[in-house]
């Protein structure tokens, strides 16, 4: 059973293999998703991010978890770690 259905939808639908063709960067993807979804759905994503980050996984394990949720984006290619990037996503999803 998937503990993070909202994040799975977000990562698999918005950070798919061609996401770079549709957006100028990862922040643009996050902003577009935030604007496309209602506040309640975005709040669920924030809650799921809280739970994922609370698992206290190391960076490789966080990366594996996010990839398992369907993300094709790898923040390490942009000089960031997985925890750092997920924390930035969390901040960006706040109103």
Spans of features found by a protein language model:
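Charge-rich, solvent-exposed alpha-helical interaction surfaces
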Residues: 10, 29-32, 48, 65-69, ...
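Amphipathic alpha-helical interaction modules
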Residues: 19-57
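Short terminal alpha-helical segments
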Residues: 1-32, 90
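Amphipathic alpha-helical binding modules
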Residues: 66-95
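A glycine-biased, small/acidic residue-tolerant capping/turn segment at secondary-structure junctions
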Residues: 60-64
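Charged/polar positions within long, soluble alpha-helices
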Residues: 54-58, 91-94
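Alpha-helix boundary/N-cap detector
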Residues: 2, 40, 44, 77-80, ...
